[in-house]
Swiss-Prot record:
Its main location: membrane. The chain crosses the membrane at residues 8-28, 66-86. It comes from Natranaerobius thermophilus (strain ATCC BAA-1301 / DSM 18059 / JW/NM-WN-LF). Keywords: ATP synthesis, Cell membrane, CF(0), Hydrogen ion transport, Ion transport, Lipid-binding, Membrane, Transmembrane, Transmembrane helix, Transport. This is ATP synthase subunit c. PANTHER family: ATP SYNTHASE LIPID-BINDING PROTEIN, MITOCHONDRIAL, ATPASE PROTEIN 9.
């Protein structure tokens, strides 16, 4: 029989793993943005500054989901508030 604490720890590990899958989406999105940015600079070299600025802003916004997922995963693994409720 599984006790409550073991069940919470197992569910937390699964949840942390699922949260880290969000990092895949952020990486794919940043890859597409960098590719399209390089393509745009190749087509319009005069607008390089504006294109790079917009691309970096978009990459920063896309990265926030990965950072939030990492924070949630670390909280679930190392500072789990649910264990104290048992």
């Amino acid at each position: 029989m599984i006790d409550g604490q073991s069940l919470v720890l197992a569910a937390s590990a699964i949840g942390a793993g699922l949260a880290m899958i969000a990092g895949i989406g952020a990486g794919i999105g940043q890859g597409f943005a960098a590719g399209k940015g390089a393509e745009s600079v190749g087509r319009q070299p005069d607008a390089q500054g504006d294109i790079i600025r917009t691309m970096l802003l978009g990459a920063a916004v896309a990265e926030t989901t990965g950072i939030y997922a990492l924070v949630i995963a670390l909280l679930l693994l190392f500072a789990n508030p649910l264990i104290g409720m048992l």
